[in-house]
Amino acid sequence: MSDPIWKSRIIPAEQALPGRADALSPTTSHAITGREIKADTPEGMQEIFLGLGCFWGAERLFWETDGVWHTAVGYGGGTTPNPTYQETCSGATGHAELVRVVFDPEMLSLDQVLKIFWEGHDPTQGMRQGNDRGTQYRSAIYATTPEQLVAAHDAAARYQAELDGAGLGTITTEIVKAGPFYYAEDEHQQYLARNPSGYCGIGGTGVVCPIGRHAPT
């Protein structure tokens, strides 16, 4: 059993669970598109990994968005290789629950993706999101290109100004280059498509993010 302290701060790498050599590869197809869950990113499209609380509801935000080609959920940002859901929820892996978002930048700009991200959760809550508490629920942007990193930091600064104006707190979102991404088990992929009345714990601040207002040209 993990120490409860790792629910409120990320466990040091040397204390994290050892994990396993073999990946827990999903075997089902995407419930919305029918594509393989681990589908490669097509040429010309972009991939980004986003953490905004429980990945069940977070994934739905993106598969419902025009211009998003593919989504999948998994774990990243921590230490333990090939973790399970239970291990991640224990706080002993250091991972966040993430959504892999693959989008067509000719239909949906990066700023529009980030706008959905910022407005879709409360990025000021640290190691929790609403009633969901633990390091796995932290706000995170794991970028796959230098351009994404720059855009994410710029968007964070602009959104912080709006949050300040609304009297809200400081953004705690982790914005870094993406590391390994580990796919979650079958039952978590497109969970709310397979379980329409299932739990969705995410919710935004109500503050509009002043980016991504125009379609790509």
Swiss-Prot record:
It comes from the Bacteria. SUPFAM superfamilies: Peptide methionine sulfoxide reductase. One of its GO terms (biological process) is protein modification process. It is an enzyme of class 1 (oxidoreductase). The active site is at residue 54. Its EC number is 1.8.4.11. The keyword Oxidoreductase applies. Keywords: Oxidoreductase. It catalyses: L-methionyl-[protein] + [thioredoxin]-disulfide + H2O = L-methionyl-(S)-S-oxide-[protein] + [thioredoxin]-dithiol; [thioredoxin]-disulfide + L-methionine + H2O = L-methionine (S)-S-oxide + [thioredoxin]-dithiol. It holds the Pfam family PMSR. Belongs to the MsrA Met sulfoxide reductase family. Has an important function as a repair enzyme for proteins that have been inactivated by oxidation. Catalyzes the reversible oxidation-reduction of methionine sulfoxide in proteins to methionine. This is Peptide methionine sulfoxide reductase MsrA.
